[in-house]
Curated annotation (Swiss-Prot):
This is Lipoamide acyltransferase component of branched-chain alpha-keto acid dehydrogenase complex, mitochondrial. It is found in: Mitochondrion matrix. The gene is Dbt. Binds 1 lipoyl cofactor covalently. The lineage of its organism: Eukaryota, Metazoa, Chordata, Craniata, Vertebrata. The modification N6-lipoyllysine is found at K105. Residues 64-139 form the Lipoyl-binding domain. The branched-chain alpha-keto dehydrogenase complex catalyzes the overall conversion of alpha-keto acids to acyl-CoA and CO(2). It contains multiple copies of three enzymatic components: branched-chain alpha-keto acid decarboxylase (E1), lipoamide acyltransferase (E2) and lipoamide dehydrogenase (E3). Within this complex, the catalytic function of this enzyme is to accept, and to transfer to coenzyme A, acyl groups that are generated by the branched-chain alpha-keto acid decarboxylase component. It catalyses: N(6)-[(R)-dihydrolipoyl]-L-lysyl-[protein] + 2-methylpropanoyl-CoA = N(6)-[(R)-S(8)-2-methylpropanoyldihydrolipoyl]-L-lysyl-[protein] + CoA. Residues 217-252 are annotated as: Disordered. Keywords: Acetylation, Acyltransferase, Lipoyl, Mitochondrion, Phosphoprotein, Transferase, Transit peptide.
Length: 482
């Protein structure tokens, strides 16, 4: 009888158990974790959807947070503040430029990760900032208190949940790469990164953009090309360099920063390399004529054509025959790594100092494509805007010291590379032809330096002879172009 009374009471007062959803907040995103919602009645157990809605208030985010300098990559631990784009009291949005910093390898624009008001700048111009340390204080915008209806939805399947987690993975990319993607309306989730741990590099963005839009302009019809009239060659005089101001007071001491600091590291390491030199003379008479014919064609396509694209392409063809010159050695010279890509560096003299950006994959580029890339690097280099990707990864280097003046040089190898060439000025000099007649020749001298631990003189000489043959007879390059 007692059991019957208990059963009757249970049937009259059905027990309803409700397990409520709860919320956890990670950063600024609210993640819903559902618990089961069920009702228990007699004599049948069944699952049902709740008919009510839960209400929650948005998290108030009006607080001052420290914006720390993120890891820029390439082992960079400190940078110099070159320019502030904001000041205290300014209002910024996500991806707005905060400042321009310069490391010993590249210049990088730092962008905001928050919407808010700048409360404090931790550094002045030319101060040294360290990775992981606060850069600015920013008061994030407060979200107005609001209540949101939470609509109950069926449980998400395991496959869907896994897919969402993959989508939510963090994309590895530097602020400069993210800004480049944003300026070109590219979603980083659609780009496959080729860097370490899937990091998206600037090359990946440019490659993705080229696939979407195409980067090479079609050649212009010959009928539209109007070569500029030849200009009279006046005698030029060197422009006198302005004398530095004379300091009559105390001596001045400045820290070594930026590209100068990079030169200290690189040249100190280069002292450990036993250099040997090799020089030769190149007759560029035929190449000078060919360039004069192609200059208006390239100009019609919007590209300034110099001699360097020909020098780089000839060097790449030579490296295919002598891959040891496109190799690198480890610190103790115990291992040699033969590089598949010909990333040929070009030494540039800029207001910021000596920089050596490199043209990637010269072995698969045409002379015109090399000229396009050189134009881009020169524009960025003159304004101090070269990125880390442009300044790293070189495998072989040419230095055009002749553009400033000089005939010979003793170039210093850039570790871990094993060879470098210095190009002198092109001069009109008398030479004898095969018949013994004197003619006006366009002569350039080249000075090579190589790592004598792994390169012998015969190898350097054979490479130089092959490179020379391509430049003295440009038509020969057509036989080996791929």
């Amino acid at each position: 009888m007692a059991a019957a009374r208990v059963l009757r009471t249970w049937s009259q007062n059905a027990v309803r158990l409700t397990c409520v959803r709860y919320f956890q907040t990670f950063n600024s995103a609210r993640v819903l974790k559902p618990k089961c919602v069920c009702s228990v009645g007699y004599p049948l157990f069944k699952y049902s959807q709740p008919r009510h809605s839960l209400r929650t208030a948005a998290v108030l985010q009006g607080q001052v947070v420290q914006f720390k300098l993120s890891d820029i990559g390439e082992g960079i631990r400190e940078v110099t503040i070159k320019e502030w784009y904001v000041k205290e009291g300014d209002t910024v949005s996500q991806f707005d430029s905060i400042c321009e910093v310069q490391s010993d390898k590249a210049s990088v624009t730092i962008t905001s990760r928050y919407d808010g008001v700048i409360k404090r700048l931790y550094y002045n111009l030319d101060d040294i900032a360290y990775v992981g340390k606060p850069l600015i204080d920013i008061e994030t915008e407060a979200l107005k208190d609001s209540e949101e209806d939470v609509v109950e939805t069926p449980a998400v399947s395991h496959d869907e949940h896994t897919h969402q987690e993959i989508k939510g993975q963090k994309t590895l990319a530097t602020p400069a790469v993210r800004r480049l993607a944003m300026e070109n309306n590219i979603k980083l989730s659609e780009v496959v990164g080729s860097g370490k741990d899937g990091r998206i590099l600037k090359e990946d963005i440019l490659s993705f953009l080229e696939k979407q839009t195409g980067a090479i302009l079609p050649p212009s019809p010959k009928s539209e090309i109007t070569p500029p009239p030849p200009q009279p060659k006046d005698r030029t005089f060197p422009t006198p360099i302005a004398k530095p101001p004379v300091f009559t007071g105390k001596d001045r001491t400045e820290p070594v920063t930026g590209f100068q600091k990079a030169m200290v590291k690189t040249m100190s390491a280069a002292l450990k390399i036993p250099h040997f030199g090799y020089c030769d003379e190149i007759d560029l008479t035929q190449l000078v004529k060919l360039r004069e014919e192609l200059k208006p064609v390239a100009l019609a396509r919007g590209i300034k054509l110099s001699f360097m694209p020909f020098f780089l392409k000839a060097a790449s063809l030579g490296l295919l025959q002598f891959p040891i010159l496109n190799a690198s050695v480890d610190e103790n010279c115990q291992n040699i790594t033969y590089k598949a890509s010909h990333n040929i560096g070009i030494a540039m003299d800029t207001e910021l100092g000596l920089i050596v950006p490199n043209v990637k994959n010269v072995q698969v580029r045409s002379v015109f494509e090399i000229a396009m890339e050189l134009n881009r690097l020169q524009k960025l280099g003159s304004s101090g805007q070269l990125g880390t990707t442009d300044l790293t990864g070189g495998t072989f280097t040419l230095s055009n010291i002749g553009s400033i003046g000089g005939t010979y040089a003793k170039p210093v190898i850039l570790p871990p590379e094993v060879a470098i060439g210095a190009l002198g000025a092109i001069k009109a000099l008398p030479r004898f032809d095969q018949k013994g007649d004197v003619y006006k020749a366009q002569i350039m001298n080249v000075s090579w330096s190589a790592d004598h631990r792994v390169i012998d003189g015969a190898t350097m000489s054979r490479f130089s002879n092959l490179w020379k043959s391509y430049l003295e007879n440009p038509a020969f390059m057509l036989l080996d172009l791929k």
